[in-house]
């Protein structure tokens, strides 16, 4: 087999980063990204894009930390390059604050971000309702820039972007030899995974250019994340809620919570409401599977279920998915091909 034809289903940050990795690292392959929605209409476009990873009950912390470290290193290289502005990657410093001392005073990712330390008493005076805090510098990924930048890289490597709704992965055979499923919440329908479900997130995007530092409540529900074009104010976690229409009452509550952390936000203007459905799952699904139908076999690599952590671990999980794709490619190019998969 000469050129291996690879289809990546899904065009959010997981799909595009996986396609970019495969294009870059897998020799003699063609890559086509297939999705019914591309930027700016993906869930990833609503994401605040702060690199602060969550935990998942069924994903081991060492694995999660590796993905986060690889993602942080990848984006740090971009942030130090001339591509930083086009890719929408920059450093941002700030505080994570707690009303009481957390059980885990040092999170697993503390040695990956920059300058992680406990907040001083002087810093905590800014937040009188909080008694403990952490200060650090992390990266912010502006998805409105980063997703088009990834698309450009994919096309620059000879990849294709195809707007199409896939109802069944078997539609992609025999046109493709390997399928990479990065369909996020779509995997509930596409591969019948009932463990992936929506967690509705509503945020506000406001003009407040004087806000330079991020502020994040330790629970992660309330946050103020400054970006290059606007400040993201959040947020909500509504499990099982499929509603994509903004809730005006919730917007008022979010704004009130954020103003309690940063009173100057009362002067913010041009406030927009955004809603996204996070593809939540007990653990990220990153594995190979062989679909069998009669005599036909279709190698599939799954990479979905990142919930609120997609931006934080996208490159690390894309690298792992690419390693699985390479295993599939090796088997296809070996006599007695799919029997070993």
Curated annotation (Swiss-Prot):
Temperature notes for this entry: Optimum temperature is 45 degrees Celsius.
Principal place of residence: other
Enzyme class (EC, first level): oxidoreductase
GO biological process, any: D-amino acid catabolic process
InterPro entries given in the database record: D-amino_acid_oxidase_CS, DAO, FAD-dep_OxRdtase
Keyword Ligase: no
Motif (Microbody targeting signal): 339-341
Function of the protein: Selectively catalyzes the oxidative deamination of acidic amino acids. Suppresses the level of D-aspartate in the brain, an amino acid that can act as an agonist for glutamate receptors. Protects the organism from the toxicity of D-amino acids. May also function in the intestine.
Oligomer status and interactors: Tetramer. Interacts with PEX5; the interaction is direct and required for localization of DDO to the peroxisome.
Family named by the database record: Belongs to the DAMOX/DASOX family.
Protein name, entry field: D-aspartate oxidase
């Amino acid at each position: 087999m000469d050129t291996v034809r690879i289809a990546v289903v899904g065009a959010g940050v997981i799909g595009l980063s996986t396609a970019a990795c495969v294009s870059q690292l897998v020799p003699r392959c063609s890559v086509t990204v297939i999705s019914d929605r591309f930027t700016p209409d993906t869930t990833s476009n609503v994401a605040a894009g702060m690199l602060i990873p969550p935990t998942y009950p069924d994903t081991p912390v060492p694995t999660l930390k590796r993905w986060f470290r690889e993602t942080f290193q990848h984006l740090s290289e971009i942030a130090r390059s001339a591509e930083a502005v086009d890719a929408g990657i920059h450093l941002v410093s700030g505080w994570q604050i707690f009303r009481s001392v957390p059980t885990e005073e040092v999170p697993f990712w503390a040695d990956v971000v920059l300058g992680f330390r406990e907040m001083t008493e002087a810093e905590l005076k800014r937040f009188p309702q909080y008694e403990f805090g952490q200060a650090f510098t992390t990266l912010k990924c502006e998805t409105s820039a980063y997703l088009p930048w990834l698309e450009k890289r994919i096309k620059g490597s000879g990849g294709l972007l195809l707007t199409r709704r896939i109802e069944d992965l078997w539609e992609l055979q025999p046109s493709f030899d390997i399928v990479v499923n990065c369909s996020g919440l779509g995997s509930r329908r596409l591969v019948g995974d009932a463990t992936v479900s929506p967690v509705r997130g509503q945020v506000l995007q406001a003009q407040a250019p004087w806000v330079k530092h991020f502020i994040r409540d330790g629970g992660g529900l309330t946050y103020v994340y400054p970006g290059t074009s606007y400040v993201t104010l959040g947020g909500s976690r509504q499990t099982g809620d499929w509603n994509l229409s903004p809730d005006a009452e919730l917007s008022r509550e979010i704004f009130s919570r954020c103003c309690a952390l940063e009173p100057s936000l009362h002067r913010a203007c041009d406030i927009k409401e955004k809603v996204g459905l996070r593809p939540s799952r007990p653990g990220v699904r990153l594995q190979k599977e062989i679909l069998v139908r009669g005599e036909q076999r279709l190698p599939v690599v799954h990479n979905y279920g990142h919930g609120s952590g997609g931006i934080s671990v996208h490159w690390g999980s894309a690298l792992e998915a690419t390693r699985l794709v390479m295993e599939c490619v090796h088997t296809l190019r070996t006599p007695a091909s799919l029997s070993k998969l």
